[in-house]
Design a protein with these regions (language model features):
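A generic structural signal for short hydrophobic patches within well-formed alpha-helices
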Residues: 10, 42, 79, 115-116
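Residue-level signal for well-ordered alpha-helical positions
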Residues: 16-17, 48, 85, 121
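Short glycine/serine/threonine-enriched helix-capping/active-site loop
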Residues: 37-38, 74
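Active-site neighborhoods of divalent-metal-dependent phosphate/nucleic-acid chemistry enzymes
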Residues: 57, 69-111, 120-123
Length: 123
């Protein structure tokens, strides 16, 4: 299964894996799954770090690769979906992850209940 992980799932997987449910940890560890960290997540982390909302002392691209995660670029097809998406969720980064999920037909691993209001699968 191909899965996009939300930003908080990425951070928890790296630093606080016990915050993840057993099912989520199992899915992340299952070698038959391809787990994606979006370039949107990388941008979100860097922007939050630059304005002092988050302290990051690691390179998230390198850490994603070291952890066995693949990177998923935000593409034009996903960007075009943003125009028609309802504003159930106001966070622009989450909206872009939702658009990627819809464009690629990959589920999103998240604890954010607002994401389930969109026509994407949530795990």
């Amino acid at each position: 299964m191909n899965v996009i992980i939300d930003t908080h799932i990425f951070l928890w997987a790296l630093a606080e894996p016990l915050k993840l449910s057993d099912a989520k940890r199992s899915a992340l560890e299952d070698l038959s799954n391809r787990i994606y960290v979006s370039t949107v997540t990388i941008a979100e982390l860097m922007i939050k770090a630059s304005v002092g909302k988050l302290q990051i002392d690691f390179n998230p691209v390198a850490k994603a690769k070291e952890s066995g995660f693949a990177l998923l670029d935000f593409n034009p097809e996903a960007a075009l979906l943003l125009k028609e998406m309802p504003f159930f969720h106001k966070d622009p980064f989450d909206r872009m992850l939702i658009a990627q999920s819809i464009a690629h037909n990959y589920p999103i691993m998240t604890e954010d209940s607002k994401i389930s209001l969109y026509p994407c699968r949530v795990v």
